[in-house]
Amino acid sequence: MENKLTIYNTLSRQKELFVPLHAPHVGMYVCGPTVYGDAHLGHARPAITFDILFRYLTHLGYKVRYVRNITDVGHLEHDADEGEDKIAKKARLEQLEPMEVVQYYLNRYHKAMEALNVLPPSIEPHASGHIIEQIELVEEILKNGYAYESEGSVYFDVAKYNKDHHYGKLSGRNLDDVLNTTRELDGQSEKRNPADFALWKCAQPEHIMRWPSPWSNGFPGWHCECTAMGKKYLGEHFDIHGGGMDLIFPHHECEIAQSVASQGDDMVHYWMHNNMITINGQKMGKSYGNFINLDEFFHGTHKLLTQAYSPMTIRFFILQAHYRSTVDFSNEALQAAEKGLERLTEAVKGLERITPATQTTGIEGVKDLREKCYTAMNDDLNSPIVIAHLFDGARMINTVLDKKATISAEDLEELKSMFHLFMYEILGLKEEAANNEAHEEAYGKVVDMLLEQRMKAKANKDWATSDKIRDELAALGFEVKDTKDGFTWKLNK
């Protein structure tokens, strides 16, 4: 298949044809979560966005090594160089070991990702497991003159780097702007410049997580982990680095600076960023206190939710917008997504009820849908356009089911194949099990109603109807027992 995939490169600010450095191999690194709390809708978006990319690249025949890290050390409060480590703080408040906090929330993150049908990455490295690599990175930057030691900590010299290179090329900022918007915080006097960022921090006596280094017992700066682990697993140069748009500055800007300062050039060819989930126009996030975690969505337990929403409803809701567009949360939007997904799912089920005719009449464009979906995917993963084409296909199916059109066996198989490929394999949607409480309650009411009709038939000595209801239910797996008070039943699974 000819490669026509274009992706928006944040670095060049334009769509570019995707050309892997070492085809058919593709290296992709995505910033994963800092595991000090439950994953929320904002965490679901990058996971789903880059899951789509992973799935599509794999479908196109590439051998993708997908690395998504786990931040379990070094991420300080407010994404700054001072303050308490987010995980260490949670551990202190909960009276747990930091790695207990990490493991608990990592297990819950994995469970949520599995529910959302997000494929696991090829490698999921932990920052705490790569301290040696991060120390080696800091040593290289020091050796090349772009960092300095101060009171046991090591800082990146942004001004020195900017003289030789361009600090701010990813975010479009210049150093003067950065300096004017960087606050001088207490305890930052050891920095030469407020814009300098920590590569290694000397740990205070109360800091739980610490490792020996040439400079002090301490811990790596937040930005080091991705540069070090990206290099370890994908090499000095790799294809794609992704993450949320909120990471462009400072995190990814600092990653580029670290890469250039340590090895002389940028490691990454394409930088990709998904936009934010918002609530009333404000970014959803733990630090804003306005987030709804995924478990609350799945069970409808948050005060802002009017009902529970299934994992596939959440996935479909996110895919209805292009990954570079903002998505504003509302119950109305989620309910519309729920209904839309149900329409598509019912249409796919309807395919199995269609008897093919000798030719297709009354509908046009069956064979064009596949190419249209490919065109949309190749246009920077334009999932909302793919979904629009799937709805076109659903309308064709419903027209045939309503006996207003006919479809040939060849076109019927094409629709089945096209829906399976784009809806399930590439967009990663799936049919959800119908054994939830709402469905079970509905089934129970129907069975009770039938058995009440059977009781009336027995009372009227209509044995034929009574036996027919019992036998039909038995054929469906329902075991019915008559009692002196009426009846009991159970479903034999």
UniProtKB/Swiss-Prot annotation:
Assembly and oligomerization: Monomer.
Protein name, entry field: Cysteine--tRNA ligase
Cellular component aspect of the GO annotation: cytosol
Annotated positions binding ATP: K286
Binding note for cofactor: Binds 1 zinc ion per subunit.
Gene: cysS
Lineage: superkingdom: Bacteria
Lineage: Bacteria, Pseudomonadati, Bacteroidota, Bacteroidia, Bacteroidales
UniProt-listed InterPro entries: Cys-tRNA-ligase, Cys-tRNA-synt_Ia_DALR, Cys-tRNA/MSH_ligase, CysS_C, Rossmann-like_a/b/a_fold, tRNA-synt_1_cat_dom, tRNAsynth_Ia_anticodon-bd
Organism whose genome encodes this protein: Phocaeicola vulgatus (strain ATCC 8482 / DSM 1447 / JCM 5826 / CCUG 4940 / NBRC 14291 / NCTC 11154) (Bacteroides vulgatus)
Motif range ('HIGH' region): 33-43
